[in-house]
């Protein structure tokens, strides 16, 4: 499996839309602490599996972020803070991650996961009551014998599981190994 590129929009530390192109062969992500390497890893994992890694908690789905006496994460917190701060009442902020991959047969796939948050009236921007956050939307597009095929939600998850079966998912917080 070859990852051709990733486009990240308003996801965690990534503000607005940013695209990274990857070349064939080995690609290294190197940088100082706090510069977005772990958030990039989260973007890959979120687009494929709908989860992000939270230190001290582990893998969590963004549709159900953890709430406990020791830790509370608001439903909107994986969306970029600058985008949320700049939003006006009734603005919709979209967070998304899209990857383009090529399988071993040369077939291209575009996988995209997105979520939208609507800015509500009457609360400070960083209040949980200030946002109405929708569920994750998942889409997989690829060419088929009948033209471009687009799969959504459960069918898209099935296609991702076909492309990345459990037996080849070697994932830890510090590295991502794809076939």
Which residues are covered by each model-predicted region?
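Glycine-centered tight beta-turn/hairpin loop motif at sheet-sheet or coil-to-beta transitions
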Residues: 13, 104-106
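Pre-Walker A-like glycine/lysine-rich segment at the N-terminus of P-loop NTPase domains
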Residues: 1-54, 59-67
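Intrinsic-disorder/low-complexity, polar/charged segments enriched in Ser/Thr/Lys/Arg/Asp/Glu/Gln
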Residues: 17, 94-96, 110
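A short catalytic or substrate-binding loop motif that flags glycine-/basic-rich loops and adjacent residues
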Residues: 87-94, 104
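Conserved small/polar residues in nucleotide/adenosyl-binding loops
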Residues: 174-179
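Residue-level recognition of well-ordered beta-strand positions that form the cores
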Residues: 7, 98-102, 112-114
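Short, hydrophobic/aromatic-rich segments at coil-to-beta transitions
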Residues: 4-6, 91-98
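Glycine-rich phosphate-binding loops of NTPases
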Residues: 60, 69-77, 81-84, 108-173
């Amino acid at each position: 499996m070859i990852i051709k590129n990733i486009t990240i929009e308003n996801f965690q530390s990534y503000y607005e839309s940013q695209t990274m192109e990857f070349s064939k062969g080995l690609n290294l992500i190197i940088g100082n602490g706090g510069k977005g390497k772990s958030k990039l890893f989260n973007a890959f994992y979120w687009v494929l599996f709908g989860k992000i890694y939270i230190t001290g908690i582990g893998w969590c789905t963004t549709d159900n972020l953890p709430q406990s006496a020791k830790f509370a994460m608001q439903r909107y917190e994986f969306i970029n803070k600058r985008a949320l701060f700049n939003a006006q009442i009734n603005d919709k902020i979209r967070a998304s991650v899209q990857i383009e991959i090529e399988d071993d047969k040369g077939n291209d796939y575009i996988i995209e996961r997105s979520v939208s948050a609507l800015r509500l009236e009457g609360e400070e921007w960083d209040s949980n009551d200030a946002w109405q956050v929708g569920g994750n939307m998942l889409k997989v597009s690829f060419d088929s014998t009948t033209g471009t095929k687009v799969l959504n939600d459960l069918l898209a998850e099935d296609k991702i599981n076909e492309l990345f079966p459990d037996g080849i998912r070697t994932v830890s917080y510090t590295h991502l190994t794809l076939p």
